[in-house]
Amino acid sequence: MKISFFNFPDDLLYEPERHVWIKVEENKVVSVGMTDLGQYLAGKIFQVSVPRRVGERVNNRTILFSVESAKWIGKIRLQIEGEVVDINERVIKNPSIINEDPYGSWIIKVSVTDVDLVKRAFKNIQDCRSQFEEEANRIVSWKNSS
């Protein structure tokens, strides 16, 4: 789905407040990354840190990753409980690829303990469309007034 000039694939789940997408994969694994709108708001991303290692347990109090750009520094915690199964080293070494391809540049993969909980905790694009539209419209209005 296109909202303003931002893309939001229909097959993903979203956490609009944190500008994060979730993809539920096979075997209870979820991939996590930044939305197109999130990378735009952050500006050029120059550092992504994952303070967890593969095999480590995570929960909703755990920082899954942090992102640093010229405009923003953010630590991302999500309603995910499980075990880290993969970290995208390509993103760690070259974080600006999130700006180029936010949906092809997942950051961390977690084998979750309860997939149904993840599906309830995150929203499909239809359920959070108005939140993203509101934010995108603010950006367009700001750009037009500049």
From Swiss-Prot:
Coiled coil: none
The keyword Transmembrane helix appears for this protein: no
One Pfam family here: GCV_H
Source organism superkingdom: Archaea
Lineage, highest ranks first: Archaea, Thermoproteota, Thermoprotei, Sulfolobales, Sulfolobaceae
Name of the molecule in the record: Probable glycine cleavage system H protein 3
Assigned protein family: Belongs to the GcvH family.
GO CC terms: cytoplasm; glycine cleavage complex
Residue ranges of every copy of the Lipoyl-binding domain listed in the record: 29-111
Co-factor: note: Binds 1 lipoyl cofactor covalently.
Record PTM N6-lipoyllysine, positions in chain: K71
The keyword Iron-sulfur appears for this protein: no
Subunit structure: The glycine cleavage system is composed of four proteins: P, T, L and H.
One example of a Gene Ontology biological process annotation: glycine decarboxylation via glycine cleavage system
Disulfide bonds: none
Source organism per UniProt: Sulfolobus acidocaldarius (strain ATCC 33909 / DSM 639 / JCM 8929 / NBRC 15157 / NCIMB 11770)
Keywords: Lipoyl
Gene name of this polypeptide: gcvH3
